[in-house]
């Protein structure tokens, strides 16, 4: 099993950062470069039960045309605080679990913590490919998530004006 975690800070209060992640409705589509996220079910008022279908690039040697899909559902949603997702992905049949937590900081800033575990079902494929594929899939997640939050804040009229930092660990 692979485990990747990182955190970063943004110049916005928790409520504004939460709003970037939440408030999606059934049928919404989020496109960030080669990553496409379709909201299949928006969940309840807090996002509990949200279901999304994700399309993202993977290494060519998986023989899928460089494309992968995952089906994800969100649970354990605590408004303005944290949530969890579970996912099943292919072509390398796998399970991922992710946790996101928001911490309010002084000065109206927020620290975002993210952790994901990744597990390939087939024992042979797990031995041969799990680590290298997870590294390929998650190599830019830190920057992409931070950039997505900052763009979302800017679109909401709350630009991140101070430098933010990313700490990553895992694998």
Residue positions per predicted region:
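Short, surface-exposed coil-to-beta transition loops
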Residues: 3-5, 65-71, 94-99
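Hydrophobic ligand-binding cavity/cleft-lining segments
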Residues: 1-47, 170-171
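Ser/Thr- (and often Asn-) enriched beta-sheet segments in non-cytosolic proteins
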Residues: 5-9, 36-38, 53-55, 84, ...
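Glycine-rich portal/gate segments that line the openings of hydrophobic small-molecule binding cavities
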Residues: 28, 38-91, 143, 147-170
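A short, structured loop/turn motif at beta-sheet edges
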Residues: 11-15, 44-48, 75-82, 101-113
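Beta-strand elements of well-folded, non-transmembrane domains
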Residues: 10-12, 56-60, 91, 118-122
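Beta-strand/loop substructures that line and gate deep hydrophobic ligand-binding cavities in soluble
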Residues: 86-143
């Amino acid at each position: 099993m692979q485990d990747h975690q990182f955190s970063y800070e943004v110049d916005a209060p928790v409520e504004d950062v939460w709003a970037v992640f939440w408030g999606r409705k059934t049928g919404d589509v989020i496109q960030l470069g080669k990553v496409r996220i379709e909201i299949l079910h928006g969940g309840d008022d807090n996002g509990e039960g949200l279901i999304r279908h994700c399309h993202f690039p993977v290494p060519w040697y998986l023989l899928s045309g460089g494309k992968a899909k995952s089906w994800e559902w969100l649970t354990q949603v605590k408004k303005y605080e944290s949530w969890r997702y579970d996912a099943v992905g292919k072509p390398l049949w796998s399970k991922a679990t992710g946790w996101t937590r928001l911490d309010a900081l002084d000065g109206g800033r927020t620290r975002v913590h993210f952790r994901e575990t990744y597990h390939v079902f087939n024992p042979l494929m797990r031995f041969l490919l799990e680590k290298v594929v997870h590294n390929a899939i998650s190599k830019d997640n830190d920057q992409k998530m931070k950039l997505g939050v900052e763009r979302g804040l800017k679109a909401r009229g709350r630009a991140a004006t101070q430098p933010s930092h990313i700490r990553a660990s895992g694998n």
